[in-house]
Amino acid sequence: MKGSAFAIILGLVVLCACSFAEDEQDQFASPNELLRSMFLESRHELIPEVEGRYCQKWMWTCDSERKCCEGYVCELWCKYNMG
């Protein structure tokens, strides 16, 4: 009785693990897709300025060297200027 209950529980665990793995494969076409999406999202955080330097957007640390983009204010990190 204990052996069959263990086999049923083990079967359910394997079934859940397999379905989870299929969901993950559907979400990302390749293993590198997650890294690629992370870099594509962060790539837009830096915008070139006229002087060839880059300005910082929201949640990037800022100081006298690393200026915030237009419309953002520096308060340890760049925050959107609400007005």
UniProtKB/Swiss-Prot annotation:
Q: Which compartments does it reside in? A: Secreted
In what tissue types does this protein appear? Answer: Expressed by the venom gland.
Print the keywords alphabetically.
Disulfide bond, Ion channel impairing toxin, Knottin, Secreted, Signal, Toxin
One GO cellular component term of this record is: extracellular region
What family does the database annotate?
Belongs to the neurotoxin 30 (phrixotoxin) family.
Q: What is known of its domains?
A: The presence of a 'disulfide through disulfide knot' structurally defines this protein as a knottin.
Q: What is this protein called?
A: Kappa-theraphotoxin-Cg2b
